[in-house]
Amino acid sequence: MNLSSCYLEDTELPFIGYDYYPTGLGTYVEYQVDSVWQDDQIGPIGSAEAHYFLRDVNESSFVDEEGRPAIRVERYSKQNQLGGFSNIKDIWYRTRTSKIAEQNEENVVFIKHNFPVKEGKTWDGNSKNTLQTLQLIYRQTNIPKVWDYEYKNVHEPYTINGFTFDSTITVLQLDRTATLGLSVFAQEVYAKGIGLVHKQLNVIDIQLPTFGDPFDTDTFGFQYEMVVTDFGQ
């Protein structure tokens, strides 16, 4: 009897989930981005909106400082749907190892995935960041240092912006709700063979004012959403 062949036939190998974070060169995903910023303490001018479009392209490969294969991601932007993408907004870097997927966003590194993908699995997505870095990028002094990312709705279908994806995973990064104080909701959805298709990031701080009506509140924070509009190679 060939024991190795019996093992292969009778044992179900674990699903790793690399397909949810593709690294193939030339692949791209396009997004519509909507964001709202608010700061009640500076009066009527304390709010703004931004609406634009992004195209993320896995442009080339290289070896990073730790000797790992990595991807250079060119992020193009435009203000409306007309015309093509010609303006490079950012250069990011992606590294996918056998155990994790990292994304370097202007020298801020997030652990986007922890393999193998499994329902309910958790990890600290900010393990490579300092509290000072998080306070700076989110503009909140009381932002938590540890964000326990969690896999939810693993291999479930997902519909967004007219697309229906057969197999997706949701990464709930943080869900902290407060009537007063800091509320944070951060979540990303990844489709198999495509990558990120929906991102939500809401960071809102509601405080009682130092002066004035004690029943009034001041709001400071932002809401940010990315929704897939196209993808391919």
Please annotate each region the language model reported.
Residues 2-5:
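C-terminal motif of bacterial Sec signal peptides marking the signal peptidase cleavage site
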Residues 7-233:
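Conserved functional acidic sites
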